[in-house]
UniProtKB/Swiss-Prot annotation:
Record carries keyword Aminoacyl-tRNA synthetase: yes
Catalysed transformations (reactions): tRNA(Asp) + L-aspartate + ATP = L-aspartyl-tRNA(Asp) + AMP + diphosphate
Protein family: Belongs to the class-II aminoacyl-tRNA synthetase family. Type 1 subfamily.
Function: Catalyzes the attachment of L-aspartate to tRNA(Asp) in a two-step reaction: L-aspartate is first activated by ATP to form Asp-AMP and then transferred to the acceptor end of tRNA(Asp).
Name of the protein in its database record: Aspartate--tRNA ligase
The species this protein was found in: Parabacteroides distasonis (strain ATCC 8503 / DSM 20701 / CIP 104284 / JCM 5825 / NCTC 11152)
Region (Aspartate) residue spans: 197-200
Length: 585
């Protein structure tokens, strides 16, 4: 037996016990004739003591230990004279009587502690060392607990966990697929699933009623802090349900996770907001409601006063930052540069301060009387000490999105985006279609199987762009953690949907014939939702990137720098797969 206890569970009550521990050397330090060694495992750290006067040979052996050596020690638990309140084992130490070096180690390329000197690339290259850090390991422990609680909740609600295939057919709609060549079928390819969407619908046709799966999904798309080429979904589907049934079920799951994992209890139902209102009031379909700064439209007030930027604009809108009138000219110039960055794309920024006497001082004073500025102030409900920031443009939707970026930046600067505060809402009534000007055709905003709102079905023939989807997203703190819809279960309605999306009958049959055929054998009304487990965990952990809650993530170029993947295939493998690599310069 390598150990009788772990490095994190000894306490004062264990004083006098003889125990054996095993783990990694965190650090060593010498003080006079004493050597102190911190031994670490997944469970914690324990201080070891070696005494030169008691056993000189053993102490000399301890002096030769390096960082990250793997050791086994046996000794007696004793109360520490100098206690460490920062660790659970800080009241005790182990007086070592026996030391075995199980493995030596090279000097690590970075310090394996809470605060490390390793950059992102270095830590990803040596991810197996980075995972020894307690702060990283805790994220994966949190992930385990959340996945466990998801399974427990859904099991109690009658869901069955069913695995679906990883090798499926490619579907050109949506993000790019990762493709896998088939050796046994030369010239043909599998695709890795972007989601088990059609397969879980088939399970509903099969009569499984309630399905879930914690499943890997794959999308070959450009990466951001909240995206990875492979990610994990909590994928769910239910039969004989309407939208309200799905929302209640998965709001219940979110509340369960918050209560059990974070100790946060939501007694009220989550807020609901239409997509139209979210875009109009916050410029985003995933608004962060931890703070205010709701958009105020100023077309009626600010147009027609000789300021050509506003007079020629299709949209004028602004936000009110409470207490920010103290912003200096330098800070305001920095905000102007922020909105003019290519990532935001605004042409400029107009600001107005509400002075202590209630008067308004703006950057466009020469065009506006105090009477007009007071009317603007009242539209915001602004008070003395507040700062009003205004953007305008010739495209209302685009300008709202720019204003959204400014709002989030102000939220950051004013410390209003507290990671320990959670505001949850459902965004509902999404458009069913998005119009693409370049292609001159509609695309599904979610996917082709999303059911239209029953009230809007007649509009499919007359005004498809006005049709609302029976779809919903769960948004927490400005992060879309989950989304889903009620699905089409009628083959005739599905045919109409494909036609509106530009599918020929042959193409629809080729790509989705298996699903259309299944519908002919009695498909129940059904709907579902998928949570992004990575995003959910990063939200609970207060992380800025989902990479930190994935054991072996890819970098922003989609590479695994530890495995050096993707890599070049051996020519013999290419021959076996009947493939030729011809990279276009």
């Amino acid at each position: 037996m390598y150990r009788t206890r772990t490095c994190g569970d000894l306490r004062l009550a264990d004083e006098g016990l003889v125990v054996t521990l095993a783990g990694w050397v965190q650090k060593t330090r010498k003080m006079g004739g004493m050597t102190f060694v911190d031994i670490r495992d997944r469970y914690g750290i324990t201080q070891l003591v070696f005494n030169q006067e008691v056993d000189a040979a053993l102490c000399e052996k301890a002096n030769k230990l390096g960082r990250e050596f793997v050791i086994q020690v046996t000794g007696t638990v004793r109360e520490r004279s100098s206690k460490n309140a920062h660790i659970p084992t800080g009241d005790i130490e182990l007086i070592v009587s026996e030391l075995n070096v199980l493995n030596t180690a090279l000097t690590p390329p970075f310090t394996i502690e809470e605060e490390t000197d390793g950059g992102d690339d270095l830590r990803m290259k040596y991810r197996y060392l980075d995972l020894r850090r307690a702060c990283v390991r805790k994220n994966l422990e949190l992930r385990h607990r959340m996945a466990f609680e998801v399974r427990r909740y859904l099991d109690e609600q009658g869901f069955l966990e069913v695995e679906t295939p990883v090798l499926v057919n490619s579907t050109p709609e949506g993000a790019r697929d990762f493709v896998v060549p088939s050796r046994m079928n030369p010239g043909q390819f599998y695709a890795l699933p972007q989601s088990p969407q059609t397969l879980k619908q088939l399970l509903m046709v099969s009569g499984f009623d309630r399905y879930f799966q914690i499943v890997k999904c794959f999308r070959d798309e450009d990466l951001r802090a909240d995206r990875q080429p492979e990610f994990t979904q909590i994928d769910c589907e239910m039969s004989f349900v309407e939208q309200e049934d799905v929302l209640n079920m998965f709001e219940g799951m979110a509340k369960h996770l918050f209560k059990v994992i974070r100790g946060v209890e939501f007694k009220e139902s989550f807020m609901r907001m239409t997509w139209q209102d979210a875009m109009k009031q916050y410029g985003s379909d995933k608004p962060d409601l931890r703070f205010g700064m709701k958009f105020v439209e100023l077309m009626d007030i600010m147009k027609g006063h000789g300021f050509s930027v506003f007079d020629n604009a299709a949209y004028i809108g602004g936000i009110c930052a409470e207490g920010a009138a103290s912003y200096t000219r330098k800070q305001l110039d920095a905000l102007t540069e922020f909105v003019k960055r290519p990532q935001v794309g605004a042409k400029g920024l107009v600001y107005a301060r509400v002075e202590a006497d209630g008067n308004v001082k703006s950057s466009v004073d020469k065009f506006y009387s105090q009477e007009v500025l007071q009317e603007m102030k009242n539209a915001f409900g602004a008070k003395p000490g507040d700062l009003i920031l205004i953007l305008s443009g010739d495209d209302a939707m685009k300008t709202r999105k720019q204003l959204c970026e400014l709002r989030l930046e102000m939220g950051n600067q004013l410390g209003l985006r507290d990671k320990d505060k959670f505001v949850c809402l459902w965004v509902i009534d999404f458009p069913l279609f998005e119009w693409n000007e370049d292609d001159q055709r509609f695309y599904a905003m979610h996917h082709p199987f999303t059911s239209p709102n029953p009230d809007d079905i007649p509009l499919l023939d007359t005004d498809p762009g006005a049709v609302r989807a029976n779809a919903y997203d769960m948004v927490i703190n400005g992060v879309e953690v989950g989304g889903g819809s009620i699905r089409i279960h009628d083959s005739q309605l599905q045919d109409k949907m494909f036609k509106l999306l530009g599918f020929t009958e042959e193409r629809a049959q080729e790509q989705f014939g298996f699903l259309m055929n299944a519908f002919k054998y009695g498909a129940p009304p059904h709907g579902g939702l998928a949570y992004g487990l990575d995003r959910f965990v990063s939200l609970f952990a207060g992380l800025d990137s989902i990479r930190d809650c994935i054991a072996f993530p890819k970098n922003n170029s989609g590479r695994d720098v530890m495995l050096d993947a993707p890599g070049v295939l051996d020519p013999a493998q290419l021959d076996e797969l009947n493939l030729i690599v011809d990279i276009k310069k």
